[in-house]
């Protein structure tokens, strides 16, 4: 697990944290207009930040379960679309982790799609190749204001894996996560 520390300005006392995951850009069922609207809504708020939690694209490889030809764009075109779609969030990304769709490409070809996207968006230093523990410091701690200390919040980030389509698998994954945190 990677530790990521984000120190926000002391004058920022309150933030919103939004999670974007499983949008599967390039999947025929992806609501790209809905994704773009959500990104615009987040970008319009001065105190809004985002966690990119994997499966931003719908990449398939020759050996993956999904059909490599069912996506609408090539892997490179999907990366470019992700960079364009999430560009308004540049400077607002607290953390980025890959999902299983990005990990497929890394395992097959050694190309880390999530890092490429995060780096292009100015958040390469806030990328974790697996799980991340993100410490976000902001505002001033009311009990330690005279010392100039900020209040720090911790956020555990992981795309998750497995579980499939059955409820039993999802329950087992939640039990696994309960052992971690």
Pin down the residues of each PLM region:
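His/acidic metal-ligating clusters that form di-metal
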Residues: 48, 95, 119-181
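Core catalytic region of metal-dependent phosphoesterases/phosphodiesterases
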Residues: 4-128
């Amino acid at each position: 697990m990677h530790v990521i520390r984000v120190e926000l300005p002391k004058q920022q006392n309150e933030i919103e944290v939004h999670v974007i995951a499983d949008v599967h850009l390039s999947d025929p069922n992806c609501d790209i207009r809905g994704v773009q609207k959500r990104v615009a809504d987040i970008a319009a708020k001065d105190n809004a930040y985002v966690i990119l939690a994997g499966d931003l694209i719908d990449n398939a490889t020759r050996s993956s379960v999904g059909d490599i030809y069912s996506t609408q764009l090539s892997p490179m075109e999907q990366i470019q679309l992700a960079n364009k779609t999430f560009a308004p969030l540049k400077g607002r990304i607290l953390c980025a982790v890959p999902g299983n769709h990005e990990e497929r490409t890394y395992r097959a070809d050694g190309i880390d799609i999530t890092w490429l996207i995060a780096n292009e968006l100015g958040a390469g230093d806030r990328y974790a190749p697996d799980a991340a523990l993100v410490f976000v410091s902001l505002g001033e701690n009311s009990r330690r204001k005279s010392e100039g200390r900020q209040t720090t919040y911790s956020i555990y980030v992981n795309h998750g894996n497995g579980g499939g389509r059955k409820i039993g698998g999802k329950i087992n994954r939640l039990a696994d996560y309960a052992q971690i945190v």
